[in-house]
């Protein structure tokens, strides 16, 4: 498995968790999810529950939202 790109969700969570001084266990407790979920999220596991991802992001004042994807015919 390759390292996550700097703009990825996994990188965001790992970076913010470390900056806050949280262990994976502490972040999981704050978000109401298990340490294993935090580990899976930080490793970009492709099958994560969005409701649980949003619980983790809420600790950092964020949420997943919809944005328009660029179209192939746009410059």
List the predicted regions and their residue ranges.
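DNA major-groove recognition helix of helix-turn-helix/homeodomain DNA-binding modules
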Residues: 51-66
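Short basic helix-loop element that most often maps to the first helix and adjoining turn
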Residues: 11-26, 30
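Short, conserved catalytic or interaction motifs in soluble domains
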Residues: 43, 68-69
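Helix-turn-helix/homeodomain-like alpha-helical modules used for DNA recognition
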Residues: 71-75
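A detector for short, charged/polar N-terminal pre-domain segments
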Residues: 1-8
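Recognition helix of helix-turn-helix/homeodomain-like DNA-binding domains
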Residues: 32-46
